[in-house]
Structures are given as structure tokens and as C-alpha cells.
Amino acid sequence: KGMGEEVIKLLLKKTNGPRILIDIKHMSPKCRKDFYAFIKIEYWNKNDRVPLICSHTGVVSKSRSLDALIQQDDDNELLDDSNYLHENSINLCAEDILIIAESNGIIGLQLDEKRIAGNNIIDIIKNNEEVDSTELRRQYVKVIFANLFEMVKTVNSVSGWDLLCIGSDYDGLVNHLDFYPTSAEMPVLRNDMLEFLQDPEEISQPGFNYSLSLIEIRRLMFGLTAETIIEKLF
């Protein structure tokens, strides 16, 4: 721990060129909790607002605090077929999001279906023979926006959109989203997301534990146009 803290201090020094900010992506919830406490004591309390970064992630909706994430059984969450979002502790909880927002940091949404969606939801969508390719793409976009809206809902302010971007992880993801397998499809994704915001609908799936009404979606846009939100994300 002592050596790790010294390395962090060296990376965040201002006297040897630009700072190298720390990416919290692969930290456990316990590590994140310790890291935030260290940053607060060593920097924030000394009027040095070091921004926090999570380069690529999804969000959980059930465990709201880091302590709850630390205590939860990740294996049970992976086996819970009612999860619409990916509720594993590798993803951010509300406490993470609020701390990152307080730091004026940034969160990138990962484009890996096994990080932004529940264990069973993608298979159900894919195996629905009544869903054509256009509707399937819209269902993928709904999963993406479920993560984004959940984070904005946590911040509960238009400033929540300034916190977010696409953090694709194309160089390391395992299960890409169909229709958007590589960076070459980013313009397609951008257009599909824009179309959803221009004509949004409830985000839900029968038998799953997450839903977002059309009224709530419109509220969480905070008066921003679809085009403005997409520009912020991309």
C-alpha cells in the first residue's frame, strides 16, 4: 500500500511534466473506496481537485454504495437471470458516480455486452424470432441508454451529461455488441442513438428488474436536444 501511494503521488506530480491521471476501471470496490479516501486527503482537502477517470464501464442499479458492492456476492448476481443491467462489482455504483462527478471527472461507457447488460437479457433479445434487425438494434441501444440514464439519474442534474462519453474498449473487449463490432461502426452507433433520443420509448423487458418510463427519460434529458446529448457522448 505504501509503495502504491508513492507511485500515485509521482504520477500526479505537477513538477515533472503533465500529470498522469489514474484510471479506476480495474479497481475493486474496496480499492476504489481506498483510492477515493487517499485522493481526498492528499489532494482535494488541499484545494487540488484531481479529476477521477473511469475509462470504460457499465453501471449497477441495485447496490448504491461501495460498502454494498464490497459485501455483495458477484457470483449470485451473475446467475440472477432477472438482471437487466450487469450488476457485478466491476461496474460503478451510485457512490462512485457521485464522487467522480464531484471531481469533474469522466466516465466512459463500455461497448461490451457482458459489462453493460445482464447475463441473460442479450440472449433473449437475440433469440426472439419476432425481432427483426432494426428492432434488435433498437434493443441494443436501449441497453446502452439504460446505463447512461442510470448515471444521469444518480447525478440528477443536466451536468450528468457532461460526465459521460463512449469508452468503447475496442482494443480489449470480449463480447462486442452486434451491429457495432469495431470502431468503423461508430457512425452507425451514433446515428442509432440519435434516432432513439429523437423518438424515445420506455426501456423495459418482461421478466427483468429494470425499467425506465418515457416520462423519466424525457426528464433525464433535462431539456437538452438529442443532438446536444449525442455531441457530448461522442
For the regions a language model picked out, list residue spans one by one:
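Active-site environment of divalent metal-dependent phosphoester hydrolases
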Residues: 25-34, 59-62, 114-117, 172-174
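Aromatic-lined glycan-binding groove of carbohydrate-active enzymes
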Residues: 90-129
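Extended hydrophobic/aromatic segments used for targeting, binding, or gating
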Residues: 50-54, 59-67, 76, 96-98, ...
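Mid-to-C-terminal alpha-helical segments outside catalytic/metal-binding sites
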Residues: 159-163, 179-234
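Short acidic/histidine-rich active-site segments
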Residues: 24, 109-114, 159-181
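Outer-membrane beta-barrel pore domains
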Residues: 116-119, 135-139, 172-182, 196, ...
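Surface-exposed intrinsically disordered loops and tails
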Residues: 45-46, 62-91, 120-135, 142, ...
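Histidine/acidic residue-rich metal-binding segments in metalloenzymes
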Residues: 1-21, 27-53, 65-78, 88-105, ...
